[in-house]
A protein has these predicted regions:
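Core SAM-dependent methyltransferase catalytic element
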Residues: 112-130
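Conserved beta-strand signature within the Rossmann-like core of class I S-adenosyl-L-methionine
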Residues: 66-79
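Short alpha-helix
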Residues: 87-110
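A short acidic, Gly/Pro-enriched loop at the edge of an enzyme's catalytic core
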Residues: 30, 34-44
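A short, conserved alpha-helix within the catalytic core of class I
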Residues: 50-64
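Short conserved AdoMet
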Residues: 17, 64, 101
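Acceptor-substrate binding/catalytic loop of class I
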Residues: 79-94, 116
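Class I SAM-dependent methyltransferase SAM/SAH-binding core
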Residues: 1-33
Length: 130
């Protein structure tokens, strides 16, 4: 499978530079004026520890019908355990599943305390796009 990696710091992905099946894009989605992979279809999208509400729809749109979305990030209540503490970066209860439910079949959803690797309040969803 071809894989596209997108992060604001791609230094940990340097070993993928010569891999013909890997595309590495450096972009800070919190400050970017546009969604850098908009319009490109993906059979699977994985998002971890990231929330930028104004592009959440773009992320979901990037998944092809029949494709898989795996999304996990921090939720309200995480302030007790560490960063992020700013509500701008914390999902409200049920926010992720409400956003995804319209166009995806939900395979699994969790909201609560994750203990490993470190305590945090998270929301995560696995869903297939209709």
């Amino acid at each position: 499978h071809r894989v596209t990696f997108l992060d604001r710091d791609v230094s940990a992905l340097a070993d993928l530079h010569n891999n013909p099946k890997a595309a590495v894009l450096c972009s800070d989605l919190e400050t970017s004026a546009h969604f850098p992979i908009g319009g490109q279809p993906f059979d699977g999208v994985v998002v971890t520890n990231f929330l930028q509400r104004d592009i959440l729809g773009d992320i979901c749109d990037a998944v092809t019908p029949g494709g898989l979305l795996l999304y996990e990030t921090f939720g309200t209540g995480n302030e007790t355990y560490g960063r992020p503490r700013n509500s701008k970066f914390l999902l409200k209860p049920g926010e992720l599943i409400k956003t995804v439910r319209a166009n995806f079949d939900i395979l699994g959803f969790e909201h609560g305390l994750r203990r490993i690797p470190s305590p945090a309040i998270i929301q995560r969803v696995a869903a297939v796009k209709r």
